[in-house]
Structures are given as structure tokens and as C-alpha cells.
Amino acid sequence: MKIDIPCPPAEVAHSRTLPGTFYADPVIFEAEKQAIFMKSWHYACHETALAEKGAFVTLQIFDQRVFVVCDRDGQIRAFFNVCPHRGHHLLEGCGQEKMITCHYHGWSFDLTGRLAAARESGEGKKFVGSGLCLKPVQVGFLAGFVFVNLDTGAAPFSNFTAELAASIANVIPDLSGYKVREGTSYFGGDYECNWKVAIDNYLECYHCETAHKSFCDMMDVKRSTFTLHDNFIYQFVPSGGKETSAAYPINLVEDAVDGHFWLLFPNIVFSIFPGTKNFSVSWVEPVSVEMSIRRFVTLTPDNISKEREAARSKWGLSVLNEEDRQICRSVQNGMSQRGFDMGYYLLDSLNGNLSENTVRQFHRMYMRWMFPDAGVRT
């Protein structure tokens, strides 16, 4: 169901930010669900979770349930997690099954989604379900991760992410050797803010020198740069060249020393953080207009120090992530204050990251999805 909301003023995503109401109005949040999240790509799992035939994972995108499964030929497929007979859900959690069986009336489907058996539908019964299939969901792959899209009319994920995939491969060409290790996947915690507050904050390091002291002691944020694309934003933060900092120790010879960060619209982040070699995906999951959850999954190669990786992860979660959570909580409160209407951008024509060009680009992407007739270009 399409929800019509007024297009914001013309200066939005040019000289002014999105209005505060776009972060605090439940009606706008509901409109975003339909215009953005029911049509965009969502993280499902790493492909190693589906390495065995019949292996499956489930996920929920707002009120829509989905499962992803490896069929008997090794192909990864996704379906809406609902039985077409009477609407009961089919699978829970993750696991491995030879058939997909509904525990309401016992209908079963093979791993390609086709109806295999409807209990008691033999001779003498009127049955019109022959040839029935589960409704498929689009699947895409990037950097070993599996993504799904509820919009059957969406362009293939490979088209949407072609430039992004090339950018990641250019930075980390040996990524295929990285795996999800025990202890490297973790939950980032609740963010008491609208999802866009968290993304806005992530996209600029203009606030880093005042809000992230240990990060700035480790990195040379003044030499940060960015590139803007139609569907993603890339940020590069060079190393400060110190093995010892207020954050955690770095081996300048063996470790990843620079920071690389990619945002895929609307809410998926890929990153390489200084320290033991790593590659992460994280996403800001909208829960309500004023609540989000940030989740992380990290890949690492075989030959890393588990102790040093744990130290890097601990700092990221307990220091950097916590600093951002506090910032975002305060900003969310400001979105409904009478003294705030629309914000301003600090822009840099030289693509320096101590600016908010990246935030403006994100707002332009947002406007293009929410108001396609407004003529906003990215």
C-alpha cells in the first residue's frame, strides 16, 4: 500500500538536510517501509551457512518472513516463509531439512519450492493445488554474503552492486579466503534513534575529532577522502602510522592499517577496520520510527591472532559503537525539538571527509527512492 507524503522543500539534499519530521513522524516511517525497504536488498547470511544441501536460514523484514535454502543441486534459493495452503509459517531459525513441511496440515514442498505432497489429497478429494509452488524471493551475492529482495521486479543484485563489488575487490582481492570465525559475529545493540540518524552519523567523520578521541589517535582523519556513486558511498580513512594508540595495538607490517568503508543504500555497510585482517558487513535494522538495531558479522583469514582480533572487536563494540549510540540518541531527541527544523551541510569541494558531502549524497539517494518524480539527482 502506497502512502502519500508531501515532498520536502527544494533545498533539501542541496543546501539543507532532511527535515526533523522525516526522522520522527510514524507516517513517514511507514511510507519508507513501502518505498524503500520492501524494494531494497537485505542481509540474510554468509554463504557458508548454506553450504550443505537442505541447509536453511530464516529472517524477518518487518512483518514479512523469508527463508533461504540450499537445494539438492547446490543452488541457493529464497522464498516467503508462508504456506500457500492456509498461511501458516513453514520454518523457524536455521537448520537442515530434506523437505519443507508445514506443521499445520502437513503439506510438504521440495527444496525448489514445488508442492511435493498434500496430505489426504488422494482419490475422491477435490484438490486444485497441483503444480503449486512457494512464492520466490530474489537472491543476490556479494563478498560471500547472501542478500534477499522482496520486490520480484527489482533489478538483479549484481546490476545494483557492480561498481561496489569492483571497489571492494580492488581493496581486498584475497577476500575469498576470509571466513566467519567463531566469536567474530556479534550483535551491536539497540540504537534509540531513527535508522537515518544512525546512517547520517556513520557517513561523516566531521564529528570524529570531538566524539571519537581514540579513533582519531589511531587514524589520520584529516586526510580522509570519499567517492560518491548512485547506489553506494566509499570512504577511505588512512592510518595514523602508529603501532600504539589510545584504541588498540596495530602491526604496521602485517595488519590492515587503513580504514575502508562502503555504504550500500539504504542501510548496509561493508568495512575494513585497522588491526588484524578483517572484512565486516553490518546493517542498521529499522524497528520503529525512533528505534533501530545495528548488527555486525566479521570475516577474517585463518592466520590471525584470536586475542588481537578479540581486542579490536571489543574496542569497536564497547568504545566506538557506544560513543555512536550516545550521539544518535541525543540527535534523535533533537529531531522533535521546536528549535530544530532542517539541518545544514558542511560541504567540501575537494572531497575531504571532514565534511558532510556524504550525508548529502545519502539524502539524495533517499529522495530519489521516496520521491522519484522530484528530479533529485545523485
Locations of regions flagged by a protein language model:
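Short, contiguous pre-domain boundary segments
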Residues: 3-21, 178-180
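Short clusters of hydrophobic/aromatic residues that line enzyme substrate/ligand-binding pockets
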Residues: 44, 90, 115, 215, ...
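Rieske [2Fe-2S] iron-sulfur-binding domain
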Residues: 49-152, 156-167
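C-terminal catalytic domain of Rieske-type non-heme iron oxygenases
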Residues: 69-70, 75, 81, 145-378
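Generic structural signal for secondary-structure transition and capping sites
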Residues: 37-41, 88, 207
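Short Pro/Gly-enriched beta-strand edge/turn motifs at strand-loop
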Residues: 39-51, 118-123, 263-268
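Non-catalytic accessory segments flanking enzyme active sites
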Residues: 18, 22-61
